[in-house]
Every structure is written in C-alpha cells, then in structure tokens.
C-alpha cells in the first residue's frame, strides 16, 4: 500500500500546514495548486489518499473527483470552506469518501486520513487472502465482495468505495438497527470528529443509485426514525441458497 498523499489546495499556507503534520506521520506528500494539475498527477500516480479542495482554479474539486472516478477509486477527502448541505452532497455525488469543512484542525485531518486508510487497507487484505467466494445474495440484490460488484435485479450499480462499504456493513447483519454513531465508528472509523449528516448523505445517495435500477433493492435500506438505519430482509427476500 502506498504511503503517498496528494494535497490539492490553491492556498500555499494550507498545503504547507497539512504537509508538515502528515510528514510527521511518515507520509510522503505531493502537492498541486489547481485542478488540472491535480487530475494529471492523480492519473499518473497511485496515491493512498487525495486531500482535495473544493474551490480550485482551472478545474474545481467536484470536476476533478468526477473525472477521476471514471478511471480510479483512489480515496478522496474533500476540503472546503462551504459547509452547506448542497455542497456536501455534490462532493459525495462526485465520489468523495469524506468531507472536512474549513477552518479545520490539522490533527483532525490526520485522524480522518488514517481512519480512511485503515478501512481501505483492511478491505485490500481481506480480498487478497484465499477464501470461499464472498457473495451476499438476496432476491433483488447481489453483493460480490470478491469482485467488488453490486447487482440490483441483475443490473450493475456503480458505487463509490464508501457507499459500497456502507452497503456491505448493513447487509451483513440483516434487520439489525444501527444508529448513526455506530455507522460512523464502524464504516468511517470516527469516534470524535464525525459529522452525523455524513451518514445521512451516503444513505440517500446509496438508495438513489439502487432505485435507478431496482426500487425493491432500494427499499431494503430502511430508516428507523429517531434511531438510524437497517437493512430490512423479509421472508420473500431471504438470501438465495
């Protein structure tokens, strides 16, 4: 696994600050000050993570993430001074895995990066070890964890890495209710710095993508009002034998 991180921000002060803190954790840092440069570097290199500012010259962060997701699944943490829900949703829609609003603590950014990489590395190790075929099957939904592929009514659904991890986590324990704090801790590995709206935004996007090809698959992700979410499996939706 690479220890190289790409920091993309048009403010030199922010790049220097993040570089200093991340280098203390033994990461190798690369920098870009505009969107076009960031996209070219990301395509040429296999970074462990990209810290991507939303407002950039030449090509903004949304455009960079959207174009990059057509070719790569490099983990992306979006950095922005805008905290409104619309901007957060746009960031996640473009393929970002996380979202941090400026002004932020550099230590928080380091913790977010480490949490994201722990999850990514854990998934890579699990997939590389010899094991029986890891597939979760329901009447309207199939999750092939070996191929990292989701089928809803036999049609492939293109999910971001974090949307996929969230779906897997819920589907592995059908009908169990998880509150938002649990999901932040287990899927995002946040205990102190997580924004609960991150969970809501990812669930919304996951449902929308599933619903495009199968309303039945989308309806399996249920909101438990005042608590959180569950992956609902009824008797006629039991995993295929």
Curated annotation (Swiss-Prot):
Signal peptide segment: none
Cellular localisation: Cytoplasm
Residue ranges of the annotated DNA-binding region, renumbered to this chain: 133-233
InterPro entries given in the database record: CheY-like_superfamily (IPR011006), OmpR/PhoB-type_DNA-bd (IPR001867), Sig_transdc_resp-reg_receiver (IPR001789), WalR-like (IPR039420), WH-like_DNA-bd_sf (IPR036388)
Consequence of gene disruption: Inactivation significantly enhances staphylococcal nitric oxide susceptibility.
Post-translational modification: Phosphorylated by SrrB.
PROSITE patterns the UniProt entry points to: OMPR_PHOB, RESPONSE_REGULATORY
Protein name according to UniProt: Transcriptional regulatory protein SrrA
Species whose genome carries this gene: Staphylococcus aureus (strain COL)
């Amino acid at each position: 696994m690479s220890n190289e991180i790409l920091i993309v921000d048009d403010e030199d002060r922010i790049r220097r600050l993040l570089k200093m803190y991340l280098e203390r954790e033994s990461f190798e840092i690369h920098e870009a000050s505009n969107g076009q440069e960031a996209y070219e570097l990301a395509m040429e290199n296999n970074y462990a993570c990209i810290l991507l500012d939303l407002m950039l010259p030449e090509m903004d962060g949304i455009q960079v993430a959207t174009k990059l997701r057509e070719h790569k699944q490099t983990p992306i943490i979006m950095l922005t001074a805008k905290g409104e829900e619309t901007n957060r949703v746009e960031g996640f829609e473009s393929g970002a895995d996380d979202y941090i609003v400026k002004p932020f603590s550099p230590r928080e950014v380091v913790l977010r990066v480490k949490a994201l990489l722990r999850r990514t590395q854990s998934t890579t190790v699990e997939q590389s070890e010899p094991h029986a075929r890891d597939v979760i099957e329901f009447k309207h939904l199939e999750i092939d964890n070996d191929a990292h592929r989701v089928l809803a009514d036999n049609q492939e659904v293109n999910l971001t890495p974090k949307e996929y991890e969230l779906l897997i986590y819920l589907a592995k324990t059908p009908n169990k209710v998880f509150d938002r704090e649990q999901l932040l801790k287990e899927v995002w590995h946040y205990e102190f710095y997580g924004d609960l709206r991150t969970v809501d935004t990812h669930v919304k996007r996951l449902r929308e993508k599933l619903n495009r090809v199968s309303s039945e698959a989308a309806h399996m992700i249920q909101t438990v009002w005042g608590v959180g979410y569950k992956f609902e499996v009824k008797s006629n939706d039991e995993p295929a034998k």
